[in-house]
Amino acid sequence: MQVTCAALFPDGLTMPVTSRFPFFAYLFACLLGLFALGGFWYGLGKPVILPDVVSATHKLQCASYTPFDKDQSPFDVPFKLRPERMDADLALLATRFECIRTYSMTGLEALPDLARKHGLKLMIGAWVNSNPVDTAKEVDLLIASANANADVVTSVIVGNETLLRKEVTGAQLAILINKVKSQVKQPVTYADVWEFWLKHPEIAPAVDFLTIHLLPYWEDDPSNIDAALQHVAEVRQVFGNKFAPKDVMIGETGWPSEGRQRETALPSRVNEAKFIRGFVAMAEQQGWHYNLIEAFDQPWKRASEGAVGGYWGLFDADRQDKGVLAGPVSNVPYWSQWLVVGGLIFIGTLILGGRVRSTRAALVLPLLGALAACSIGAWGDLARVTTRFASEWLWVALLTGLNLLVLAHAALTLSTRTGWRAQAFNAFERRAGWLVAVTGFAAAVTMLELVFDPRYRSFPSVAFIVPALVYLCRPVSVPRREIALLTFIIGAGIAPQLYQEGLQNQQAWGWALVSGLMMVAALWRCLRVRKG
């Protein structure tokens, strides 16, 4: 008996179909698929052993602290701080740090008393911006708090990255610093990215010590994790020599645990732990003063900085230890839950495919289910950390639903297509062109975003693997004019996207592979299918 198998032989070749279920081929493919699924998630989530940062009894110097819960933002109107949250936060931080650094005075009136209660010292900061009224209010509160809490406030910071944002001039900032110095007893400083200290040397004489921000991930020329500590050491050495005898404090340094790759700088929990543990060991050995960014993950920062902005914390937004400072650390701590989700997708694929008859279908169906389980699960994990707004959740739901529909179409194509499976297959077959069109549209929109507005966007490559592969292997009839335009947009964006990201960006290459080699090829093959 012979049958055309368009799912596997799109040019219309034929293959034999047996009357018996190919049990051993099916069993082999199922075991291989399950092994691949388990290996994929365990490989991503397995605990990595690193040298601990310090002994459990040794406290670190300082950490940046903002008192926002995971559902809060400083832009909330009206904004209400939660005193019980601040109290619990400081109790937790007091077990690992000697001091905390703040960035604004507004709403933090209770902080000195809480710091005193938990034995913490404070570096308090006034938020300086382009509005002179707001700035004057912040500076007045800074002076008052420093004088009223001299036992816990060890130093004051007049402005944070204000020159970077170009909200005041160097001369205006120096006047503010001198005003504060004349009215407090504590050392006074200003904090900014290290390059801006070099661009504005007139600020150095006004401060008692320099506070520089050293974030290798955000550098114009990002450092990979293996070179990041050397870069920090070199910059610190330059400042120590240039501005001696004034002390230089590293006021912000750290590494993100989630987010998009920048050239060779890859965010991950393991890389964050590598950087923090290595930096602290180096700083303690060199006798540097430092402040780590930051105490807790801040999801609200994702709105302005993309996913990466929300994940610089030593603890997550639920105040759970991320394993950055000590013990084993996992890049995907929820890998076992995603494994369960993947298992359900795998089983669902087998159920849709049913009792296949050909040996080739028996091999392909379980492997298709395993691939879909991995890619859809990885897309879900990416969405968990990147999605910020209702519109973005709608986009996630659209792509997830699209993947499941395409997976169902592919599984039914591999089935014997009898009974309800035949009816479902025919329904999918009539609408397959629109599934391709929606996939192409989503890929084209993503490509345009990654070409024209890439800085804070992650690479959603895993969301397109299943649709691209399915319709590459089995092209279907599509609306020609629309698909031709989408194919051109995606294909034209590959080179500029790679050029912007740099040829060493593995995530960018992953997107180029999925969108270029797979998606463009799939759309092109679909364009060549004539309507029946």
Language-model-detected regions and their locations in the chain:
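N-terminal carbohydrate-binding/catalytic regions of secreted carbohydrate-active enzymes
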Residues: 64-137
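Conserved, mostly hydrophobic/aromatic
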Residues: 100, 156, 210, 250-252, ...
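Substrate-binding cleft of extracellular glycoside hydrolase catalytic domains
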Residues: 105, 111-187
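Aromatic- and acid-rich polysaccharide-binding/catalytic face
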Residues: 124, 154, 192-231, 255-256
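Aromatic-lined carbohydrate-recognition surfaces of secreted/lumenal glycan-active proteins
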Residues: 126, 180-198, 245-252, 288-298
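Active-site clefts of carbohydrate-active enzymes
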Residues: 214-222, 242-272, 301
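Substrate-binding cleft of secreted/luminal carbohydrate-active enzymes
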Residues: 256, 266-326
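Alpha-helical transmembrane segments of integral membrane proteins
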Residues: 356-532
